[in-house]
UniProtKB/Swiss-Prot annotation:
Protein name in the entry: 3-isopropylmalate dehydrogenase
Family assignment from sequence similarity: Belongs to the isocitrate and isopropylmalate dehydrogenases family. LeuB type 1 subfamily.
Function in brief: Catalyzes the oxidation of 3-carboxy-2-hydroxy-4-methylpentanoate (3-isopropylmalate) to 3-carboxy-4-methyl-2-oxopentanoate. The product decarboxylates to 4-methyl-2 oxopentanoate.
UniProt-listed Enzyme Commission number(s): 1.1.1.85
Annotated gene: leuB
Length: 360
């Protein structure tokens, strides 16, 4: 029986980078006889233009029925002035929450070929390999009440709520510990327990879960210190587990240690490892349509999909090796280009990865 993959290119550079990722996926499908069947739909701004909402009900049902979802990126200035509740990003939040995709895996890996692209000294970032495990469906992005009210003095006041339940914390903590077990058996839980009640509960529950993982060395760090340590000495980290807001910020920060957010994939998983896979970067409307976007994060998201949702390790490894071989050849999109390397566009980079994968 074929496995169903739903392709959601999205907005901005999304369709361009997705075209290249799909080429790689289709070759892997053929080369390794994976039995994937691909279907396409719209999300975000493209869905607003077509359906009037950022995520149509029929698209959500397709996503539920699929074995995995591959997403490009959503959003753009065209939709920035519409009502907040129907902006493109709301489609992304809705699909995550409706599919129960509570666990976000965001690796920050520095490819040795790109050491000179990092803003930090090579000796600080060489060999960097961090996995950030971010809680994705709770916290301040989903908390209620939220809104804007008018105070007695006529001034407007905006407010949000940052709630976390024990079960929400426990399940993401388990993902963090499980990830640590297959990596370096080291886990850093990041919170703000000196100020926030939600973080105090977070730390308490993480300590409880730690009792089931005696082999894992657990540490705690306040988020402000973690942000500083990621720049000062990033290689002290192996796996980081944190909440939705902190994970959003820290994973973007960690991405720049690697030279370009255009290199970094992500996975969002439910309790059964069914997932949605997408690049860490946004829709980059400023370069959309120019054919210069880096498709490697989306291509590497395909690799994560094969690894985490389907346990197809050989095919996942082959895609990652193909990307590494292309970098060995000095082929670069503009965001990771340096003197003496070959600058190419989106399609050429995708073609290079396809050629490398075909020859493996």
């Amino acid at each position: 029986m074929s496995k169903q993959i739903l392709i959601l290119p999205g907005d901005g550079i999304g369709p361009e980078i997705m075209t290249e990722a799909v080429k790689v996926l289709e070759l892997a499908n053929e080369k390794y006889q994976l039995g994937f069947e691909l279907t396409h739909d719209v999300i975000g701004g493209a869905a607003i233009d077509k359906h009037g909402v950022p995520l149509a009900d029929e698209t959500l049902e397709r996503a539920r029925a699929a074995d995995a979802v591959l997403l490009g990126a959503v959003g753009g200035p065209k939709w920035d002035t519409i009502e907040r509740d129907i902006r493109p990003e709301r489609g992304l939040l809705k699909i995550r929450s409706q599919l129960g995709l509570f666990g976000n895996l965001r690796p920050a890996i520095l490819y040795p070929q790109l050491a000179d692209a990092s803003s930090l000294k090579p000796e600080i970032v060489a060999g960097l390999d961090i996995m950030i495990v971010r809680e994705l469906t709770g916290g301040i992005y989903f908390g209620a009440p939220r809104g804007t009210r008018v105070l007695d003095n006529g001034e407007r006041q905006a407010y949000d709520t940052l709630p976390y339940s024990e079960s929400e914390i426990r399940r993401i903590a388990k993902v963090g510990f499980d990830m640590a077990m297959v990596r370096g058996k080291k886990l850093c839980s990041v919170d703000k327990a000196n100020v926030l009640a939600s973080s105090q509960l977070w730390r308490e529950i993480v300590e409880q879960v730690a009792r089931d993982y005696p082999e894992v060395e657990l540490s705690h760090m306040y988020v402000d210190n973690a942000a500083m340590q990621l720049v000062r000495a990033p290689k002290q980290f192996d796996v980081i587990v944190t909440d939705n807001l902190f994970g959003d910020i820290l994973s973007d920060q960690a991405s720049m240690l690697t030279g370009s957010i255009g290199m970094l994939p992500s996975a969002s998983l439910d309790t059964a490892n069914k997932g949605m896979y997408e690049p860490c970067h946004g829709s980059a409307p400023d370069i959309a349509g120019k054919g210069i976007a880096n498709p490697l994060a989306t291509i590497l998201s395909v690799s994560m999909m094969l690894r985490y949702s389907f346990n197809l390790t050989d095919a996942a490894d082959a895609i990652e090796k193909a990307v590494s071989l292309v970098l060995d050849q000095g082929i670069r999109t503009g965001d990771i280009w340096s003197e003496g390397k070959v600058k190419v566009g989106t399609q050429e980079m995708g073609d290079a990865v396809v050629a490398a994968l075909r020859n493996l």
